[in-house]
């Protein structure tokens, strides 16, 4: 992870809970939580999965503008998964095109030069979204609550007069019996049929995570919509419109999962992933 601010810290905690080895680069942070390793930028970029979450600034001695350029891009492995969900200006378009030419899998939410982004780059990334950032139903509710608190304080009125009850829960029944099938979307590498029980167990957990996450936000559908609209008019206004009219979606914490049969291991991994309730 490049950046250990609010988002980077929360993501690191989630990944550690899921059993991942997490390395973090952030020159402004000197203490990290248990299970997280603080490393130099080159070591962070050398990981199999690299995800950017740093703020964008030009302040020395550690400017982040164009942090990953034609020089540092060489630190990234050819077989890596590279995600930018931080700021578009953290990496140059040239660096991303270089990565794509080497076979690196690119998942891009924040783009260099946005809203005027590279059509060539869009065609080369595995998953593309229009700077969704923290947009969700929960974010809208929280922002509204913040305004309500100020309104109540300023006008001296009762919260009950202005605050409405909003149900955020998303119920889901998960059929455990079908989770060991190799039917996970092609974007995920899975073991073949007949592999060891340990691999089948891992596949079951992977499928459970995939179905749970897709129940609240399907990035494959977001990617398809982005490409369809963008290709019809690849201009700045299209990108801005996609951001402004992004569909409402829930967060995984809203999900309430009922398993079709008792599986403590699935309860553990779904809870670690942030599912609100599993039983």
Question: What spans do the regions from the language model cover?
Answer:
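Glycine-rich adenosine-cofactor-binding loop
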Residues: 1-16
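NAD(P)-binding Rossmann-fold cofactor-contacting core
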Residues: 17-34
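Short, well-ordered beta-strand core segments
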Residues: 22, 50, 126-128
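Rossmann-like adenosine-cofactor binding region
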Residues: 29-119
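Rossmann-like dinucleotide-binding domain for NAD(H)/NADP(H)
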Residues: 79-82, 86-184, 195-266, 273-278
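Charged low-complexity "KEKE/polyampholyte" interaction tracts
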Residues: 186-189
């Amino acid at each position: 992870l490049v950046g250990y601010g609010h988002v980077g810290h929360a993501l690191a905690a989630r990944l550690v809970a899921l059993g991942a080895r997490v390395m973090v680069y952030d020159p402004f942070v000197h203490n990290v939580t248990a299970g997280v390793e603080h490393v130099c930028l080159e070591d962070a970029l050398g990981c199999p999965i690299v995800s950017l979450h740093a703020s964008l600034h030009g302040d020395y001695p550690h400017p982040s503008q164009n942090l990953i350029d034609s020089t540092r891009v060489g630190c990234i492995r050819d077989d890596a998964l590279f995600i930018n969900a931080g700021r578009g200006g953290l990496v140059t378009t040239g660096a991303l095109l270089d990565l794509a030419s080497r076979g690196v899998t690119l998942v891009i939410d924040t783009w260099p030069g946005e809203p005027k982004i590279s059509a060539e780059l869009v065609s080369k990334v595995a998953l593309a979204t229009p700077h969704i950032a923290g947009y969700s139903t929960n974010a809208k509710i929280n922002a509204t609550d913040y305004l309500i608190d100020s309104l109540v304080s300023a006008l001296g009125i009762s919260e009950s007069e202005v605050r409405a009850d909003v149900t955020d829960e998303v119920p889901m029944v998960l059929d455990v019996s079908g989770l060991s099938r190799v039917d996970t979307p092609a974007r995920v590498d899975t073991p073949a049929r007949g592999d060891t029980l340990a691999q089948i167990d891992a596949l079951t957990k992977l499928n459970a995570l995939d179905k749970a996450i897709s129940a609240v936000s399907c990035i494959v559908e977001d990617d398809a919509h982005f490409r369809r609209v963008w290709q019809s008019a690849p201009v700045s206004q299209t990108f801005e419109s996609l951001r402004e009219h992004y569909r409402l979606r829930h967060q995984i914490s809203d999900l309430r999962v009922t398993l079709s049969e008792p599986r403590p291991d699935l309860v553990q991994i779904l809870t670690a992933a942030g599912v609100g309730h599993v039983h």
